[in-house]
Amino acid sequence: MAGNEERSKGTFATGDATVGEIMEEAYSCRFDANLGEVTRLLVERGVSSLPVVDGERRVVGFISDGDIMRAIAAHKTRSVFNGGEATMLYFDDEPLDRKARELKHRNVMELATRKVVCATPEQPIGRVAGLLSKKRFKKLPVIDGDGRLIGVVRRTSIMRHVFALLFGE
């Protein structure tokens, strides 16, 4: 996994903060990684999603465990006519392990979201908290002025900041 794993550094501070002050280290995968490598990274790092970066660390996608699970759980469908009315029947005779093995060698960009919402270090965390809440995201990649990944901001990062503000810890 060493060739397809990227890591950037982040910091954490309390007070009236911007994203840059509370962002955390980001794990990412390269755009040319396969889903087997991505799944391994998700499990080994204990994360549920990863920004996908190009060779210059620009964010080009975002992949989550949910994207992979949807692909594994996808059902094949066929239409059947019953008395003149179309009825959709679901069938899936392919075992789960076979589906997972078939996904293993597919490119991450086949499942990754390509329109990625990102934060910048200068943004106030209140604005990003609102965005995370509204979009129901768990985290956002943090990018520099050139679109390169420099960290992530998570809901838990914001909650730690709020806790520190409330309790002075």
PLM feature segments, named:
Residues M1-E169:
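Tandem CBS (Cystathionine beta-synthase) repeat/Bateman regulatory domains
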